[in-house]
């Protein structure tokens, strides 16, 4: 285990990069290239240490040119570039590039610098994490994993936990992909127990602050390892799902699960599915309120994604209700196959949820969702849908549909009814904030963060806010040479000095 502490420099995942160019001089061809030990780096707003980057180039003579005056570069020898940055007094995040040129070969280093911390809050990116990050229910920890390349050119993974109160970082491994092929971060408890999916062996690993690893177990009779999706703040309850049988062979093989002190039990399932028809696959539990009282999940049959919730009573938990029952409508409709034959099905206007894990408020009073309508197309060969953000109050059992923003998704909601909405339905890159009590638009994600924390952040949307409001987890879309990446960021109180 590496036990790292808050550093003056945050360096992004190092990626070796090379640009090769063939040049012909008379009858002789020479190979020109620029090979960098690191093609991107991030700095804090102030107090940074110099960053050294290794440069291998042919021809050996190369030049480095920064794209902004706040970045300083020095070629300290034939193969070393030292990068320093001025303190960032702009109040906002900034970025630029450094161009490395060796005759006709060239490469760029992307440089990013955060704004200075203020006395109320600090903003950090988790851009070294692969496949996202999870925040614990009370905001104590954030967890994820980093990836690197082993000596044999295979992948290796390092589970990583960040203490958001102290800035301390716990890094474990790296573990070879042949042992743990880590694919997605799912959840972390306030006690620092991190759950990451294993794409090779199935199920997940669970790793704690000491580096101890175990594999969560499903109830007896299950045919696969389970997946934990969320936890309560005290770590007593975990929720998720597992397979008990095979699809199309066994009745509702996908089972929602609840663990109490590590012991798993099946959660009951509705008699009829989202379309008021016989269920054939089942579904999952996706999240649980921080206080452990309310669990939410989703059906997983075709494109239904019907959202439901349970009132947690341990092994005696009763069957769930559909989220948004007060606005849910189900009716019979005659549709057509491509060959012109007709069949009867049921269409639904109701609340849905896919694989999102942060849709419930800490005390379980509110659930964020999406209200989807279904209408037969004119030729009745397909179904036309609309989708808009919606929020359900589990105490009053009433739904608030927010249609102000067109196609949108309810991402998260606080105990006092502040809703966070993602604009669009796929590849969301921006968000707005809405007061469900007054029906008031509170502005964009950036506006709300500035109004409440006094800092300027880049565009994005909010995934989760702790019950006391001190910790925030969000998502930002970043463009790179490989396309658009979605990275997580967090807001936390300043580290005590």
Protein language model annotation of sequence segments:
Residues 45-46, 90, 415:
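Surface-exposed loops/turns
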Residues 46-52:
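Short coil/turn motif common to extracellular beta-sandwich-like domains
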Residues 57-59, 66, 102-104, 406, ...:
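A generic beta-sheet turn/junction motif
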Residues 92-104:
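A short beta-strand micro-motif common to beta-rich folds, especially ectodomain repeats
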Residues 117-497:
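Conserved "turn/edge" positions that cap or connect secondary-structure elements
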